[in-house]
């Protein structure tokens, strides 16, 4: 009895080893889980459900196998793939979740989210996030020809990489007060997120008690998952 969480795979045609590792994970690990939660940035970029990349169809087909086996798969949007929509969700058998969701797993309440909204010290990114999550702007972008969307996404990615090189590691990490605020808002003691690529399980001082903040690692040289059972929350890394 276990529920699995992953994030920040950044799947792309340029990283076939990561794709192969993810497919093995689905076939050998996720297939035995009670449920799979993907907490954003499954793909390195997403410019619309109408993008005909073969990789998207491959991943959708493999995820749909879980659906056919009766294993639910849930998805929280990341900062790279926030445009994944109902069409791809239906193709893959995934259920799209809100930015923040509280789960009741084995008798414990857990807040899950991608994690970028916790990085409140990065003011420039938060302003950018508000713009690109505007439904009107998203609709306009998705009305553009696919070729135009490809160019815009590439330019935005290049700009983001340049800006991140100038930022301190502290700015790009979560803000402690933001973490406390979300835990208290939802009245939970456990949070699971990705985004920062800094895998760890942190103890959080809530004043009257202690909580946990479990952070998923990115899939670069190895895979990363969090396994929640009735007895434990475990951060696990594994080779592709």
UniProtKB/Swiss-Prot annotation:
GO terms for cellular component: cytoplasm; extrinsic component of plasma membrane. The keyword Manganese applies. One of its GO terms (biological process) is lipid A biosynthetic process. It is an enzyme of class 3 (hydrolase). Substrate binds at residues 79-80, 122, 160, 164, 167, 195. Its cofactor is Mn(2+). Mn(2+) 2 binds at residues 41, 79, 114, 195. Mn(2+) 1 binds at residues 8, 10, 41, 197. This is UDP-2,3-diacylglucosamine hydrolase. It comes from Pectobacterium carotovorum subsp. carotovorum (strain PC1). The gene is lpxH.
């Amino acid at each position: 009895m276990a529920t699995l969480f992953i994030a920040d795979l950044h799947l792309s045609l340029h990283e076939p080893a990561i794709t192969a590792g993810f497919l093995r994970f689905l076939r050998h690990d996720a297939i035995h889980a009670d449920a799979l939660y993907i907490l954003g940035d499954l793909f390195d970029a997403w410019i619309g459900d109408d993008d005909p990349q073969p990789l998207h169809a491959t991943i959708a087909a493999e995820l749909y196998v879980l659906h056919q086996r009766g294993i639910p798969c849930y998805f929280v949007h990341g900062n790279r793939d926030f445009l994944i929509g109902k069409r791809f969700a239906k193709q893959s058998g995934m259920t799209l979740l809100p930015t923040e969701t509280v789960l009741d797993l084995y008798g414990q309440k857990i807040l899950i989210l991608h994690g970028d909204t916790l990085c409140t010290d990065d003011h420039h990114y938060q302003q950018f996030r508000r713009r690109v999550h505007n439904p009107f702007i998203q609709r306009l972008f998705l009305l553009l020809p696919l070729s135009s969307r490809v160019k815009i996404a590439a330019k935005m990615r290049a700009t983001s990489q340049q800006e991140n090189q100038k930022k301190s590691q502290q700015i790009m990490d979560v803000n402690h007060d933001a973490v406390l605020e979300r835990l208290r808002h939802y009245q939970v003691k456990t949070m699971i997120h990705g985004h920062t690529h800094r895998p760890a399980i942190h103890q959080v001082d809530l004043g009257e008690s202690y909580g946990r903040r479990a952070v998923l690692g990115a899939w670069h040289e190895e895979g990363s998952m969090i396994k929640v059972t009735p007895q434990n929350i475990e951060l696990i890394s594994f080779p592709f």
